[in-house]
Every structure is written in C-alpha cells, then in structure tokens.
Amino acid sequence: MSDLNALTIADARDALRKGEVTSVDLTQACLSAIDQADALGTFVHKTPDLALERAKAADARIAEGDAPDMCGIPVGIKDLFCTEGVPSQAASRILDGFKPEYESTVSGKLRDAGAVMLGKLNMDEFAMGSSNETSVYGNAVNPWRAGNSDAALTPGGSSGGSASAVAGDLCLAATGTDTGGSIRQPAAFTGIVGLKPTYGRCSRWGIVAFASSLDQAGPMTKTVRDAAIMGRAMMGYDAKDSTSANIDVPDFEAMLTGDIRGKIIGIPKEYRMDGMPDEIETLWADGTAMLKDAGAVIRDISLPHTKYALPAYYVIAPAEASSNLARYDGVRFGYRADMAPGDGITEMYEKTRAEGFGPEVQRRVMIGTYVLSAGFYDAYYNRARRVRALIKRDFDEVFAAGVDAILTPATPSAAFELGKEVSDPVEMYLNDVFTVTVNLAGLPGVAVPTGVDRNGLPLGLQLIGKPWEEGELLNTAYALEAAAGFVAKPARWW
C-alpha cells in the first residue's frame, strides 16, 4: 500500500485487522511525512521513539484479536492536552519546559485504546486566536494555496496545527479543542471534518483551561466516519471533571446510514450576514439543496438573539480566561522572569506574566479582569450571562418545534493570508461569528467540507445538533458529505 499516511482511520483500521499493514508501517509513514513538512509548522514536539514503541504494542494487541477501533492509528495531539512526560505548553512561553506527570483524560482514552501519539501540535497560545498566529512556536501554515499564489495562508485557529497536520496527511487524525469555533473553523479552512461534541461529552481534565464553561475537546479527521470512530474513543464520563456527563456513548459509526428522509433541517435567517461573500451564500444554498435531495425537509427558522452572541462570547470567555490564567505566576512551574536586585514577589509576578504571556492573551486577560471588576460586573458579565441564556433558549425552542439539525456556514470566508487580520482584533474575532452560538448553548456542531472557492480553497458548512445526539448529527453530516463529494486535496508545495 502506498501513501499510508493518507489513509483514513476506517481504511487503516480495516487494513490493520486484515494484516495488510502494521501500525509500525503506518507510524513510520507519518513520521517520514512529518520530517518533510517543517514548512507547515504543525508538530512542535515530536515523539518518534514513543510513537514506534506504542505502534509495536498496538501491533501485538491487534495480533491477539479484539483490539479497539483506534488501536494502531497514528494521531497528533494538540499542545493544550497534558501528556505525561511530554512537553505540554499550550503554545505559551509561560509554560516553557512544563512536562506533566499525568495524562489528560481524553489523550489517555486514546492511548488506552491503542492510538499512537506522533507528537504535540501547534495552536494559538492558550487556544486564544483564530489564525494560529499567537503561538510561541511561530505560525502553523495551511497546506492549501490560493490558485497560483504562493502566499502562506492561515489554517485557522486555535487548532491550526491539528487541522494542517490532518489536511497535509502528516497524521491520520488529531485532537482539537473548541471554545468558540476552534475545531470547526480550522476544519473548514483546511477541507477536513471537525466535530465539537456536546459540552460535557469529553472530559476537560488535563486540558489547559481557557474558558471552562465553553471548552470542549473533539476529533479532527479526514471523513465523517473517522470523526464517529475517534469521537467515540474520546468521549465518556470522568469523575475527575465535575462537568462531565454520565451518559452512555453510543456506537456512532453504526448510526451512519446516510438516511435522512423526513429529517427537518432548520435554516436560520439571522445567519445571513451583511457583506457575506456570494461564494458562502451559494455554498449554503447548495448544501441546503443537497440535504433536500437526500429526503430532508427544509424549514426556515429564527434564532433571534444570534446578533448578540459574539459580544456576549467576548465578555464571558475573557472573564473565565482571566480567572483561569491567574495561576500562572512563575512560582511552581513554567517560565520565571529574571529578577533585578531588590525585586520582591510582586515584581516577579508582574515581570513573569508580562514576559510569559503574548499580546493576545494579555489583551483577553485585561478585558476579562475589567468586565469582572466591581464597577462593571453587572453591566458586562451578568448581562452577557443573561444573553447566553437567551441564545440557548432560542435553540431549545427550535429543537422543541421539531427541527432535527440546523445548517449554517462554518466560516464567513475561505482561509486568509497570514498577517492579514492579526493587527485588527475585531476583524479576527468575526471569524467566529457562525460558531460561538454553539459553544454558548453547549450544543454539538460539526464542520463538513462541501466545496471550493474561486481560488480552489476549501469551504465548509456547519451542522448543529440537539444535545447528546452526536450520532444523529454525524449521520446528517454523513449524508451531506456523500452528496457534496468533496475529494480535493492540497497540491504539495512543502
């Protein structure tokens, strides 16, 4: 078999079971691809020896029979996940040198299922960003190029390294996290599938926290079937996470029939934004037609508080971040600034945090501290919480009225050039306009590649589902994927 690193999880699993390939073969193919792809800036901590050790163990387990679906599958792990004995820095200087003595629950579940970790993946610092330009390691780069241009494009963020690695066939799949769109937006920018599960489906234990009421881990894969396979392995109850849901995780793959006849798909009028590119409008209309042709019933719906989602999100998320990031003080772990003679503990805190956090993280911490301050708590934070409740109620009412899933664009544009929006925070924040509502409401959402723009760049649509019904959501995504027939791959330039 050639190009083993280009296989899907499902195809690799089947080949492993038939003895047509070994996990060591798959792992070596990925490690070779990684070594040739430094220009993509994806893997920031490579673990080849550990990967081959785990691959050999996976092969032995497969030979014994009855191995889990993920056994022997080479994957990348976002740098936000704590991985035992392997640097886990959240792409920040302030965690320089931090090697956890424990494994996050999600990466531990994958390890226990026999998945092979190839290394840690680039991301925006502390998951704060939409372009992977805030990382201490430097930019991750999209493997796609626009037309004949050789301009470097963003892979999206914050899970930009994960998206680029999967799209560039450096690994078969990767973990991501999604606080306001950080799985779905990069997936759409790179032509892959990204699933953000219901809040509470994946344990947050051992994942460096950004905004605790919004953060959720999920799979980033080449196909919807792969998302079903990997998602199931990542999900499940964890007593160490107080927000983890003790709800059974079904066999999502077994639910992929592609039959959506009679399913009601909602099209929210509020997602038609002023100035939205014609290509996005056309993509959305085409996706709607595809689902209708597959037997779904299309219904226009209203989510009236959508316009308040972005402002509410950019109050709540920074507020939680300012609280979560208060622990980084240079005392117990990570980076500590050099002290001048006479400096005390206050100076150490100030210098360490000023030098350890990048500009975007500092910006959000300051915003969060401001909105939580005594004089502004009610005016900003409490008001944003009330708006969040209204947004959730909008979705609850739509689903209660019989809608099975909601179809929207995943992003307001295709991938843009690195450096283009980094100087304008508001412009950058607008990249999350279609995705933040899902986090605020705690719902599952999935980005599916469905077309390309005039420059040949991938475009994705988002499906939003009912809470805890990832299986139904993935089946609808499976039908959309089949109808769209997206098979484009980036031309290799790296």
Swiss-Prot record:
Signal peptide: none annotated. One of its GO terms (cellular component) is glutamyl-tRNA(Gln) amidotransferase complex. InterPro entries: Amidase, Amidase_CS, Amidase_dom, AS_sf, GatA. GO terms for biological process: translation. Gene3D superfamilies: Amidase signature (AS) domain. Keywords: ATP-binding, Ligase, Nucleotide-binding, Protein biosynthesis. GO terms for molecular function: ATP binding; glutaminyl-tRNA synthase (glutamine-hydrolyzing) activity. Pfam families: Amidase (PF01425). It catalyses: L-glutamyl-tRNA(Gln) + L-glutamine + ATP + H2O = L-glutaminyl-tRNA(Gln) + L-glutamate + ADP + phosphate + H(+). The active site is at residues 78, 158, 182. Its EC number is 6.3.5.7. Allows the formation of correctly charged Gln-tRNA(Gln) through the transamidation of misacylated Glu-tRNA(Gln) in organisms which lack glutaminyl-tRNA synthetase. The reaction takes place in the presence of glutamine and ATP through an activated gamma-phospho-Glu-tRNA(Gln). Belongs to the amidase family. GatA subfamily. Heterotrimer of A, B and C subunits. This is Glutamyl-tRNA(Gln) amidotransferase subunit A. It comes from Jannaschia sp. (strain CCS1).
